[in-house]
Amino acid sequence: ITRDPKELAEAVREVLEQGSINLYMFHGGTNFGFMNGCSARGTLDLPQVTSYDYDALLDEEGNPTAKYLAVKKMMATHFPEYPQLEPLYKESMELDAIPLVEKVSLFETLDSLSSPVESLYPKKMEELGQSYGYLLYRTETNWDAEEERLRIIDGRDRAQLYVDGQWVKTQYQTEIGEDIFYQGKKKALSRLDILVENMGRVNYGHKFLAD
């Protein structure tokens, strides 16, 4: 979400000549954890990034931007009775690349992360007292043919399919429900895992109070 600095400064001037104003956002910031939010666009949901900079007058580090300087210049010209102070700039440093030297497998650490819930049917995240993050659905199945056609129904927002711990397919909300073809061994018992991720909850608009 961006706006031309000069155009914004002129809009702020017009408002201040009539009254007061509250700039949103004035200071960029960051949402933490899974609280990033999501925009609703018709039938499509667009998860937002964790950054909450939003092209604000001050960036996420608190440093002034071109937009801040444009509004500051406008204020000095049209409202000279208000004193102007020079903004402060925080020092920053460039970090070198950090090599990844260790990793763990999700499937090898499940017992340490959570406890299983057994059910005859797949339960929704909310039915399990969870509103954000990930759910792993697991079952065992026999393949009736060497090539099986699978479908994930009504999942959101991203689903990753694994067979015996091996990744098979990743689908996003617009792809979920499409056929997934898997080459397996006929009658062989396999473990089927579907990792579902909630990528962000709608935080405004017509879907805000929807089921």
Predicted segments with their positions:
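Catalytic-core regions of glycoside hydrolase
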Residues: 1-21
